[in-house]
Amino acid sequence: ITVIGCGGIGGETIEMLARMGIGELVLVDKDAFDLSNLNRQTLASIKDLGLDKSAVAKEKVRLINPYVKVTTFNEHIDQTNIKKVIETSDIVIDALDNVLTRVIVSRAAKEKGIPYIHGAIHGTMGQITVFLPNSEKTYEEMFNLPSIGKELNEETIDALKNVTSGVPPVIGPTPNLIGCIEAFE
């Protein structure tokens, strides 16, 4: 299973998957923990501030269940690296915080023929959607995104970046609940 995003949603998802005994995890995140993460990201602690989220996640998995094989990618996902990141995966879990990367990941999962589990939060609200390879609608169609059927060129990317603006405050239980449900799916 590949989990893309090791922050609020992803941290909880990763911990639950490790506790459930999932044998192999691929963890992806380019960010490092900072002080603002402590209120909602269960993998974050004072001693981890400034450290790469994917590296911290790997160590936490090792402490929970040393039998889980963990591979990490400390990089941003884009069209050039997504296939490499998910090449060994049977499932991709989206714990991302931006629409453009979700489109890239969802397209790659559909092309590979594997489930894409989407999770997102906004303030005190959250959502989960599971897209199977044979799902009637894609992620882009479900949310009526301006990228439907289009190449991800500069114009389409700009349109996707304009879909969401501003990040509302998030309290800890919201990403943790969504992360647990993603692991359950």
Question: Across the structure, where does each feature detected by a protein language model lie?
Answer:
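Adenine nucleotide-associated cytosolic modules
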Residues: 1-185
